Regions:
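Outer-membrane beta-barrel "beta-signal"
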Residues: 42, 47, 205, 225-238
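Outer-membrane pore/translocation modules
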Residues: 37-40, 63-163, 184-195, 216-218, ...
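Short glycine/proline- and aromatic-enriched beta-strand/turn motifs that initiate or cap beta-hairpins
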Residues: 22-77, 237
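Short, well-ordered amphipathic alpha-helices
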Residues: 46-52, 91, 163-169
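Bacterial N-terminal signal peptides
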Residues: 11-21
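Hydrophobic secondary-structure block in the mid-to-C-terminal portion of proteins
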Residues: 167-207
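Bacterial N-terminal signal peptides that target proteins for export
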Residues: 2-11
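Short loop/turn motifs that connect adjacent beta-strands in outer-membrane beta-barrel proteins
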Residues: 24-28, 53-63, 98-104, 141-146, ...
């Protein structure tokens, strides 16, 4: 039942963005999705859609973004492991500034969150939260590779997330498929109750308008210490 409003908000957000596209303005948007899991079965799955609200003027362009995600994780309470799940949806308004090959983005919006948590005794708890979400990004695209930095903060639980990604072109194909990029991620996340750090290589393959990314690496978390993670991402403009 807790997932029902989550799905409803995602559908509403997608419909809103599609209505923006259909009303107007032949403006390019972006869609991105992915799934990541670690060796303990903790996962993160997400879907995001971003669309501009008007044409770029003097490098500035406002946009709207809807981002939804589901997270499954394990925590320890008095030495006992317990499982929890949360889902959230964040509709945001943002501003993008482009200068040459660099783009800088900032966005803010409400975050709607639903959490289900195992209890020591009795049924799972179900809680709903509403808070504020802020995100900043810096992105540089070049044929030889990309640089992408992202930082976000949610005030519901004081959770911060940051990631830096760099890729390099290692094989260029003159056909529609397939050039190859290799690179790496360095990410950190946490609040006053939890923290984790991840680092690892990635491979990115453009296929027509799609960008497929495979990634994996080492993870250190407060809960389980050393571990490993792997994931897949898909990005495409529309």
């Amino acid at each position: 039942m807790a997932g029902t409003p989550y799905v409803r908000y995602v559908i509403a957000g997608v419909a809103l963005l599609l209505s923006v596209k259909c009303e107007g303005l032949a403006l390019a948007g972006d869609a991105f999705t992915g799934y990541q899991v670690d060796n303990k079965g903790e996962y993160f799955a997400y879907l995001g859609i971003r669309a501009p609200l008007m044409e770029e003027r003097k490098g500035f362009q406002p946009f709207i973004q809807v981002f939804g995600a589901g997270v499954g994780y394990t925590f320890k309470d008095n030495g006992q492991e317990r499982d929890a799940n949360l889902q959230y949806v964040t509709p945001s308004l943002g501003l993008k500034y482009t200068a040459g090959s660099w783009s800088f983005l900032g966005m803010v919006g409400p975050q709607f969150r639903w959490k289900q948590e195992d209890q020591a005794t009795g049924p799972r708890s179900n809680e709903n939260f509403v808070g504020t979400y802020v995100q900043l990004e810096a992105f540089r695209w070049h044929e030889e590779g990309i640089f992408h930095a992202i930082a976000s903060y949610a005030d519901i639980d004081g959770f911060s997330y940051g990631r830096v990604r760099k890729t390099w072109l290692v094989h260029k194909s003159e056909q529609s498929c397939c050039s190859w990029y290799v690179g790496g991620d360095l990410a950190g996340m946490g609040n006053n109750q939890f923290y984790a750090v991840q680092a690892g290589p990635l491979v990115q393959v453009p296929i027509n308008i799609f960008y497929l990314t495979l990634k994996g690496g080492y993870q250190y978390s407060q809960t389980f210490h050393s571990g490993a993670y792997g994931g897949v991402e898909l990005y495409f403009p529309f």
